[in-house]
């Protein structure tokens, strides 16, 4: 809700739609006109709808996605992609490609049920995607009146800077700050980070180091930092660490495990893919097997992301 509410304010303030076709941002790129089911959802997310039937036996459906230059992360699967190309993406019935660019900051909350959604949240869940600098300005108001037209609102700037180490900053709230809680609980998730970065985390509130809960989620490969602070304070989270790999072997296993294809073929594919061969050699061998085109395509998405 915080992200969506901020984007709705952007629509009001800047006359920009919440959903924008790709050619709005890239009017001179031919690919932007070819992906009719792909769009930007606000300024932090890119979405590709899946409108093709599920592939029988593979339990996934395909959609062609154009990735502009840069690094992109699927916020649901965690897969990291190199941009500047077209990619066939395969998804199960419960998922579609929703991508954040490197440097993206996605602000959400768990307070979305009943009357919770009527007030500004006391806790925020923030996802940060590494690989580039990025920023986001959170917007809040009284959620009831049109007083925002006269400036009755609050802005909270957030930014992520990456050089020798990553520094994520939540700046002090600005504006009519009585509209928001005086104190907030922040859960900041640094997505696609290697576990080694967990030991380097340092949290500062108004420049003073403070205690925070730090944990690592292995499957999702993210460092989670939990800290409480006044909304009038500056919060900085500093960490050093490498971007995690794409867990290729695990993803291939999960895909083959759920696919309804012969066990002998599953085993042959898995043994080949996990044999440690260089990628060009591996792709050549897979191509020579004359696999079903969608089975080959689904494996290519994982192997070449």
What does each model-found stretch correspond to?
Residues 114-305:
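Beta-rich accessory regions
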Residues 1-198, 207:
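Catalytic core of carbohydrate-active enzymes
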């Amino acid at each position: 809700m915080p992200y969506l509410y901020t984007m709705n304010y952007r629509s009001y303030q800047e006359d920009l739609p919440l959903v924008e076709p790709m050619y709005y941002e890239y009017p001179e790129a031919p690919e932007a006109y070819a992906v009719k089911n792909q769009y930007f959802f606000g300024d932090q997310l890119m979405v590709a709808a899946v409108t093709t039937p599920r592939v029988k036996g593979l339990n996934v459906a395909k959609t062609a996605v154009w990735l502009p230059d840069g690094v992109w992360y699927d916020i649901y699967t965690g897969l990291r992609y190199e941009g500047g190309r077209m990619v066939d993406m395969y998804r199960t019935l419960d998922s579609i490609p929703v991508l954040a660019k490197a440097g993206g900051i996605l602000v959400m909350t768990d307070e979305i049920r009943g009357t919770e959604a009527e007030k500004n949240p006391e806790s925020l869940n923030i996802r940060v995607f590494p690989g580039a600098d990025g920023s986001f300005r959170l917007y809040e108001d009284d959620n009831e009146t049109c007083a925002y037209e006269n400036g009755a609102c609050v802005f909270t700037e957030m930014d992520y800077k990456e050089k020798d180490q990553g520094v994520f900053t939540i700046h002090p709230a600005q504006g009519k700050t009585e509209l928001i809680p005086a104190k907030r609980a922040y859960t900041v998730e640094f997505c696609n980070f290697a576990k080694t970065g967990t030991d380097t985390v340092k949290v500062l509130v108004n420049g003073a180091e403070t205690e925070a809960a730090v944990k690592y989620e292995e499957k999702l490969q993210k460092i989670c930092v939990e800290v409480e602070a006044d909304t009038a304070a500056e919060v900085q989270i500093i960490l050093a660490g490498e971007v995690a790999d794409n867990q290729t072997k695990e993803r291939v296993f999960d895909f083959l495990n759920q696919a309804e294809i012969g066990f002998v073929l599953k085993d042959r594919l898995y043994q080949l893919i996990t044999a440690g061969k260089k990628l060009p050699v591996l792709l050549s061998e897979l191509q020579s097997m004359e696999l079903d085109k969608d089975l080959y395509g689904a494996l290519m998405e994982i192997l070449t992301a």
